[in-house]
Amino acid sequence: MVAIIYSAEFLRHETGPTHPECPARLTAIATALRKMPGANYLHWQKPSPVTWNLDPYILRCHSQEYLNKLAKLAELGGGSLDADTPVSPQSYDVARLAVRAWLDGVDHVLNQREAVFVLARPPGHHAIRNTGMGFCLLNNVAIAAHYALTRPGVERVAILDWDVHHGNGTEALVDHNPRIFYCSLHQFPCYPGTGAAGDRGQHDNVLNIPLKPGGDGKVYREAFEHKVLPFLRQVKPDLLLVSAGYDANHSDPLAYMNLIPEDYGMMTHYLMEISPYPVLGLEGGYHLPSLAKSVVETLKPLLF
């Protein structure tokens, strides 16, 4: 079984008619998951209600000033944090619900020993302490990592980020903590321009794997076998979080890599050596057919 944490509320973060990070991303994925082989082994659940006690966990990663700014911008009818990152009237509440969904994913894995896919938006891995950027408002995975360390039995958390763009926000929000380990495979050079191989974190707890444009499944397979898996084996995490972006697909309009959907199943298969019960959550991926198929392929090794 795999738990899918999803709510139609995530569709209420409005980005405009031409923005690639659109509500249709989630509906395309949800439709594909409900039709996939083994769909009866997917357990759909809604995130818990958002209450005041979520704030202390968000504030581990974001400043109160930024949260106030984001809430006010939404309250005043919306606007944008930068040229790429719109905020609609519902965006603040939806972003908080996305955080809640990720924390529910952590709880589910620890309590039920069952893998989770958090089907939520807006994405988060570019958001830094004092602002959102790159389509991201709150850094869901970084908040989830810090939250996980408050749970009994969790001493070390690993984050794997396979989005085609480096998770600059995630790295910045976790690299000071020697109990959180961050590994990113990403096209380089590419937005946001961070993630050089020499950036290792304050405690040697970061592994950046910059890949040249045009990399295919063979390139990713070699990266997993020679870099990702040795790093994670050494970490021996009590919990594995995955920033699952799908914009390294060959058909994605925002980058220049050459993965096919089946390559994501290969990556999941490798990860199961480290943890059979990961928390995966959606980041990027903007070509709807390949996005939906890639999520299906991601989950197949966890079901069969």
UniProtKB/Swiss-Prot annotation:
Keywords: Hydrolase
Cited Pfam families: Hist_deacetyl
InterPro entries, per database record: HDAC_PDAC (IPR050284), His_deacetylse (IPR000286), His_deacetylse_dom (IPR023801), His_deacetylse_dom_sf (IPR037138), Ureohydrolase_dom_sf (IPR023696)
A GO molecular-function annotation: histone deacetylase activity
SUPFAM superfamilies cross-referenced by the UniProt entry: Arginase/deacetylase
GO BP of this protein: epigenetic regulation of gene expression
Gene3D superfamilies in the cross-refs: Histone deacetylase domain
PANTHER family noted in UniProt: HISTONE DEACETYLASE HDAC1, HISTONE DEACETYLASE HDAC1-RELATED
Family of the protein in this entry: Belongs to the histone deacetylase family.
Function: Putative deacetylase.
Stated name of the protein: Uncharacterized protein slr0245
Species: Synechocystis sp. (strain ATCC 27184 / PCC 6803 / Kazusa)
